[in-house]
């Protein structure tokens, strides 16, 4: 069985790691290169580095930071934020990223997913979905773009199916309702999408306890769990999470 993954998320704004609640109220959480190194050494399986202001401020991701971070860490590394062209993807992969995450640009031009997958390989193309529960229609989640500021009107489950059909290798699924709250992942949303596509789904938004992480895997059927506040604030360590999940008989890579 393929090992389930724990992935610290580094949301970066103006060169610093930040963390907020429900996509707002950002506070400083440290230097991305230092934090990336720390999590790499602590036993994380991968890292995700998202330049959360890149799309909104119409600037490209800080390639230099990617280069410095990739030189410092020994685990696979995904980079997202403001990537809107094949050249942008190429630049980040050349700078040392293992994968790139597309979000607003994929909604605007879905062919970027298939073009990226054809040129660089599906394994390099992650598509991020920022989803929020529709208040009026049950079992429906809306897709948001531009750092959670704009409702596209797209249905998250239908969009996930299209992403899969276009050749993406992975989906990074963030519950905007859960983001930063530490009230648990949106298990229903995660399960619905995990069951609809046969590529890995990374659960994101809401981890606050060991059982939340276990639930993302067992009930949500995700392949990976994204972690931010929980780790940045020092509430739990990667080691503590892995030891717990191994005791719960989940297929986790032990820390050597």
Curated annotation (Swiss-Prot):
Associated pathway: Amino-acid biosynthesis; L-histidine biosynthesis; L-histidine from 5-phospho-alpha-D-ribose 1-diphosphate: step 5/9
Gene from which this protein is expressed: hisF
Quaternary structure, from the entry: Heterodimer of HisH and HisF.
Family: Belongs to the HisA/HisF family.
Subcellular location(s) of the protein: Cytoplasm
UniProt-listed GO biological process terms: L-histidine biosynthetic process
Family annotation (Gene3D superfamilies): Aldolase class I
Listed name of the protein: Imidazole glycerol phosphate synthase subunit HisF
CDD domains given in the database record: HisF
Keywords: Amino-acid biosynthesis, Cytoplasm, Histidine biosynthesis, Lyase
Domain of life (superkingdom): Bacteria
Source organism: Prochlorococcus marinus (strain NATL1A)
